[in-house]
Regions:
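Low-complexity/repetitive intrinsically disordered segments
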Residues: 1-6
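Extracellular jelly-roll beta-sandwich "head" domains, especially the C-terminal globular C1q domain
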Residues: 10-13, 17-167
Length: 167
């Protein structure tokens, strides 16, 4: 029962509940370089589908994780890439998050080099998962796709994002 020999009910978190959650879809595409070869990152647009708890807010390509919580963020997507590297077929992309860009780049890099396949165009699965701790202040996330080593066109990026407030 609720009281008695089994004791009082526990705090939030028991039986798999959480403080709040957010589910959305993601989309973007575009050239990741300028004519002179300089990088041109492309922001990932976020569309809220459902949420509970009010701990996550979005605006265009920005996601705000409200302070006072620890969040689990998972992105699952598909992306189509095309090389523009002078008939070599090489391409490379990576994602940034506006929070820890160095880690994010290393964790998400997709690269094709060494094989000479002119005009290559490939579909890749993309996944990213990490914990963000917003103990003292809100965390503004801005996910962007950028080229890494080679001129690359992002023909499409479509996926989902799930955010869970763990406490």
């Amino acid at each position: 029962g609720e009281k008695g020999d089994k004791g009082d009910k526990g705090d939030k978190g028991q039986n798999g509940s959480c403080a709040g959650w957010f589910y959305g879809t993601l989309w973007t595409k575009g050239d990741l370089y300028k004519e002179d070869g300089a990088e041109r990152p492309v922001g990932i647009k976020v569309y809220k589908e459902a949420e509970s708890g009010g701990f996550v807010s979005t605006y265009m390509d920005e996601i705000y994780l409200k302070k006072g919580h620890t969040y689990s963020v998972t992105i699952s997507a598909s992306m189509e890439l095309q090389s523009h590297e002078d008939r070599s077929g090489n391409y490379s992309v990576q994602m940034t998050d506006n929070y820890d860009d160095g880690f994010c780049r290393e964790a998400t890099r997709i690269k094709r080099d060494g094989v000479k396949l002119p005009y290559s165009r490939d579909q890749h699965h993309f996944s990213f998962s990490r914990i963000y701790i917003a103990s003292d202040e809100d965390i503004p996330l801005r996910f962007k796709i950028e080229q890494s080593s080679y001129k690359t066109t992002l023909l499409g990026f479509n996926g989902t994002i799930t955010i869970t407030a763990l406490d």
